[in-house]
Design a protein with these regions (language model features):
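N-terminal leader segment of winged-helix/HTH proteins
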Residues: 1-39, 117
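N-terminal helix-turn-helix DNA-binding core of bacterial DNA-binding proteins
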Residues: 26-69, 95-102
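Short, charged/polar, Gly/Pro-enriched secondary-structure boundary elements
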Residues: 102-108
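Short, charged, intrinsically disordered terminal tails
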Residues: 108-117
Length: 117
């Protein structure tokens, strides 16, 4: 007996099919997994959490908050932006960053109630 397999074939085909057709395709699942992977890096997770608390912050503030160099923070923000988890806008000489709705949802899934919405 294997604890990971059923001993009997008792497929509930209609229920299993209804679940199967509602799932994302392998490509969509891969894209979602890649976005989720963005928060596997502690620096990116701290930056996202700071944006979750501060709504909109510049690179200088994020570097100070995270105790990381500005160029490293910029690198991580570019990665988060390329995966549509943060957005940016220029305000004079500053570039301001904020979480997208998708980024906020993913951050909430990772950190739970620790994120202020």
């Amino acid at each position: 007996m294997n604890d990971e397999r059923c001993d009997l074939l008792c497929l509930d085909a209609p229920r299993a099919e209804a679940i199967r057709v509602g799932l994302p395709g392998i490509e969509a699942a891969g894209e979602a997994a890649e976005r989720a992977r963005m928060f596997s890096d502690p620096t990116r997770l701290v930056l996202a959490a700071a944006l979750g608390e501060g709504e909109e912050l510049c690179v200088c503030d994020l570097a100070w908050i995270s105790s990381r160099a500005q160029n490293l923070v910029s690198h991580h923000l570019r990665l988060l932006r390329s995966h549509r988890l943060v957005t940016s806008r220029r305000s004079g000489k500053l570039v301001m960053y904020s979480l997208t709705e998708e980024g906020r949802s993913l951050l909430h899934a990772v950190l739970g109630e620790k994120v202020i919405s």
